[in-house]
């Protein structure tokens, strides 16, 4: 194939505020290779850096429960329900899961199919608290990784492993408890390490004994390369060569992550050997190389009959769900949409409904649309942690993913800047998405061929920046939301909040109790007569009476009947018992609360704080211990009103793009603690007003018009109104035809043609240092004749002869009038498809069989994000192998 493209480069760079070097200090020598010295130098209650609160989890790992009556697959039980470790990176390696001002950041939501996450780009002792918090909220353990190279053990790694082998296990266990880290992971494929592996094994056994009683999700992982003798033995299964590394019932040491060439000949004896050792064979994880498409052959179909688990790897810097998220388009929202689709298909099955599980195929897939992919739901149940005592903490979810292009609170817009904090993700539906035409319908025949669908959207939110939308047409369909184990009592208040944007439906909330899971009790939420209103978040509350008093809630579902062209957003589901106390006011660490960055986009800042508590130094203190659900972050420009800028679960926060009226404004930062029922908040603790950081100018320029006619005025300017003045020169055939000075300059040109633009002035680096430069932008200005068309301009607009606002009653008409520019002519204009796919059938173009073809197009790049993978054009054969 031939690809021809004309490239027109703009001079606008990406201006979104994002984390920069120095915002959060992890500390020197905190990599895995120095883990032993990190522990040696730490004492309970001490800090590694002043930014420790960005790395301390404030959510205790939840315990998960089993109830086979609310499973999709009834043949899975505690003995054969596989576990899964995602031994993969999180987000982009530069900032991992630290809070950021970048909307297009990773918000993993399929927690119910993951039992442990090995954060491949985080060291053993330094994992962002936001990621720890959301994983713990879902009952998932998290560990860092020691990436020991596939080579003879180096001196530095040998020193590290020797240090681990001789480490004080009491001190190490206190470290893991305090920071909330749930294990140790080793990419162990080194050799000549016979002198270090035995002490490390001894340490692992002692550590597990210390941690398991206080943290049931604690688990160490060992890549099954390096054996008991410090040499490499790949693809040997569990046997005499690695039994000591694995451990027995008395000394559980690690779980093994098998290399990718496992087969029936290895798995069957490995399961038997694990049982002989008194270990659960589910602690053996069959490795899946997501980058290379392994395992190959017929391996996937071996798994249902083997009592082993699944381990995902791939790759070193980005996980494969995230790396290729531009599959459906390059806009941030389309990449987010594709990422969610890829994960929903991969884990829940290619039809995004675990009831429709295709036959197991022996070909690895993780694309956004892959209806033949069996998904992880073919091997495991969707697990749930929703089982705690409602007297201690309510259950509340707003279906917020943890990122957004804006931030809403109670349905009201608070900021319009992008944000990311995955620690603030709400409880997600247990299944994505279990639709069926009857309650607990478990077969594909129970799913309407043309029924409802659900997806997360970033157009609106009751809380945060996203919500769950249900849409489509159906006669009768259930959406199973949550698998629960809550002991309800009379007086508990259940709230459902939704917004009916379009269409109509009869809608019921359906609840069922343990022992009668298939017998739902319905509570009406909406009648089909309700008029859609895009501005109305409808709140419905139900008080538990004799119907559920003393019963255990097992299932929460929605029943849609007579739905037609439905577009409905879910804003809240909650179960609250009684009233909860307002938390104490946070105490700000003034010395480490500071302004970080200042630019046209606003100001970035950091706040560190602590909560009053009675815990001993070095003892973990969770938000639940201080009667807090999360924290609200405020900013206030001197002389202006306070603004809510975001929320966090950590005892630290980052602010991005705080809006100010002037570049040298003083700003103070505030934080409040929100009660467990989200109904009250503490007083806001405020810092002093602080001087802004050094202003960093934006050197990008712009023209206020794209289509310009002879003698028509246009304005050239810096996009940054604070930028110092420059000299502007318009050049034609090497000669300056017009020039001017200023931050902006308005001029006109009489002759049709293409003109270069030269800008002479200060150009600024990230450090604020100025350098005098002359930049030339080739063919930046194009003057076109009247015959090629012009964009219309409206100079004045009236309604019923008035420029004032008018009010109309139903049936009344209004007379609109305008004065404007004559815009006749023929012109070519680009069409913005908003990342929607546009195409025609190849056969309609005569492209049949193996006929060759060419593709050509003009391409205008408005900007490419630095370090972000960008796809220009992609043609692929679905039968191709990987990597392509």
Enumerate the predicted regions with their spans.
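Chitinase-like catalytic core of GlcNAc-active glycosidases
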Residues: 76-269
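Extracellular fibronectin type III
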Residues: 677-694, 767-781
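Extracellular glycan-recognition modules
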Residues: 787-794, 835-884
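Conserved aromatic anchor
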Residues: 602-625, 718
């Amino acid at each position: 194939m031939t690809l021809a493209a004309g490239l027109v480069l703009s001079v606008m760079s990406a201006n979104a505020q994002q984390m920069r070097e120095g915002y959060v200090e992890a500390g020197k020598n905190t990599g895995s290779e120095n883990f032993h010295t990190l522990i040696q130098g730490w004492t309970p209650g001490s800090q590694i850096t002043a930014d420790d609160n960005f790395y301390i989890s404030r959510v205790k790992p939840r315990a998960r429960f089993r109830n086979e009556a609310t499973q999709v697959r009834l043949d899975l039980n505690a003995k054969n329900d596989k576990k899964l470790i995602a031994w993969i990176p999180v987000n982009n390696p530069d900032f991992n899961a630290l809070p950021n001002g970048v909307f297009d950041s990773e918000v993993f939501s399929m927690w119910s199919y993951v039992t442990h996450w090995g954060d491949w780009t985080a060291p053993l002792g330094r994992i962002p608290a936001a990621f720890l918090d959301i994983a713990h909220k879902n009952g998932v353990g998290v560990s860092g990784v020691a990436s020991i190279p596939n080579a003879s053990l180096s001196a530095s790694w040998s020193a590290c492993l020797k240090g681990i082998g001789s480490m004080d296990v009491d001190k190490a266990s206190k470290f893991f408890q305090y920071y909330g880290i749930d294990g140790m992971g080793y990419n162990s494929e080194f050799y000549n390490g016979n002198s270090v592996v035995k002490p490390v094994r001894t340490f692992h056994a002692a550590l597990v004994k210390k941690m398991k009683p206080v943290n049931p999700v604690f688990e160490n992982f060992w890549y099954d390369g390096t054996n008991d003798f410090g040499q490499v033995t790949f693809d040997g299964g569990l046997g005499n060569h690695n039994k000591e590394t694995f451990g027995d019932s008395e000394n559980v040491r690690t779980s093994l992550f098998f290399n990718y060439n496992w087969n029936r000949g290895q798995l069957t004896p490995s399961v038997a050997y694990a049982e002989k050792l008194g270990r659960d064979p589910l602690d053996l994880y069959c490795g899946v190389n997501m980058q290379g498409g392994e395992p190959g052959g017929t391996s996937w179909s071996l798994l249902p009959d083997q009592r082993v688990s699944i381990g995902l790897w791939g790759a070193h810097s980005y996980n494969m769900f995230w790396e290729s998220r531009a599959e459906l388009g390059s806009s941030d929202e389309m990449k987010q949409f594709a990422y969610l689709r890829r994960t929903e298909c991969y884990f829940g099955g290619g039809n995004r409904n675990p009831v429709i599980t295709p036959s197991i195929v022996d070909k690895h897939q993780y694309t956004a649309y892959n209806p033949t992919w069996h998904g992880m739901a073919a091997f495991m149940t969707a697990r749930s942690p929703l089982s705690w005592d409602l007297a201690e903490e309510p259950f509340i979810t707003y279906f917020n993913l943890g990122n957004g292009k804006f931030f809403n609170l109670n349905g009201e817009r608070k900021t319009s800047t992008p944000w990311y904090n995955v620690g603030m993700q709400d409880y997600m539906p247990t299944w994505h998405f279990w639709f069926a035409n009857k309650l607990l319908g478990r077969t594909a025949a129970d799913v309407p061929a043309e029924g409802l669908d659900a997806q997360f959207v970033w157009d609106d939110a009751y809380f945060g920046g996203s919500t769950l939308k249900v849409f489509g047409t159906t006669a009768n369909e259930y959406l199973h939301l949550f698998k629960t184990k809550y002991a309800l009592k009379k007086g508990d208040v259940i709230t459902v909040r939704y917004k009916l944007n379009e269409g109509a439906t009869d809608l019921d909330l359906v609840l069922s109790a343990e022992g009668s899971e298939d017998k739902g009790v319905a509570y009406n939420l909406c009648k089909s007569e309700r008029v859609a209103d895009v501005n109305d978040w409808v709140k419905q509350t139900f008080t538990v009476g004799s119907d559920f008093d003393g019963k255990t809630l097992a299932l929460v579902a929605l029943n849609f009947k007579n739905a037609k062209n439905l577009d409905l957003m879910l804003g809240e589901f909650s179960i609250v018992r009684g009233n909860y106390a307002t938390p104490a006011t946070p105490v700000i660490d003034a010395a480490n609360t500071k302004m970080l960055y200042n630019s046209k986009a606003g100001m970035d800042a950091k706040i560190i704080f602590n909560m009053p508590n009675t815990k001993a130094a070095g003892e973990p203190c969770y938000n639940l211990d201080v009667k807090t659900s999360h924290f609200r972050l405020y900013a206030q420009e001197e002389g202006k009103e306070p603004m809510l800028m975001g929320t966090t679960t950590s005892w630290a926060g980052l602010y991005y793009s705080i809006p100010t009226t002037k570049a040298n404004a003083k700003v103070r930062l505030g934080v409040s603690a929100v009660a467990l029922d989200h109904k009250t908040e503490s007083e806001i603790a405020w810092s002093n007003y602080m001087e802004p950081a050094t202003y960093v100018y934006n050197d990008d320029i712009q023209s206020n018009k794209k289509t310009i006619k002879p003698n028509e005025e246009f304005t050239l300017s810096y996009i940054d109104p604070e930028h110092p003045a420059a000299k502007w020169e318009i050049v034609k055939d090497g000669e300056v035809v017009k020039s001017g000075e200023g931050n902006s300059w308005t001029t006109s040109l009489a002759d049709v043609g293409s003109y270069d633009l030269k800008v002479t002035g200060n150009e600024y680096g990230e450090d604020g240092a100025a350098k005098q430069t002359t930049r030339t932008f080739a063919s930046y200005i194009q003057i076109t004749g009247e015959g090629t068309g012009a964009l219309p301009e409206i100079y004045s607009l009236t309604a019923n002869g008035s420029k004032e606002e008018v009010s109309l009653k139903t049936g009344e008409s209004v007379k609109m009038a305008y004065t404007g520019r004559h815009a006749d002519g023929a012109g070519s204009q680009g069409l913005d498809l908003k990342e929607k796919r546009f195409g025609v059938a190849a056969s309609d173009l005569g492209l049949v069989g193996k006929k060759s073809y060419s593709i050509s197009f003009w391409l205008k790049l408005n900007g490419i994000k630095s370090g972000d993978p960008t796809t220009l054009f992609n043609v692929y054969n679905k039968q191709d192998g990987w990597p392509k």
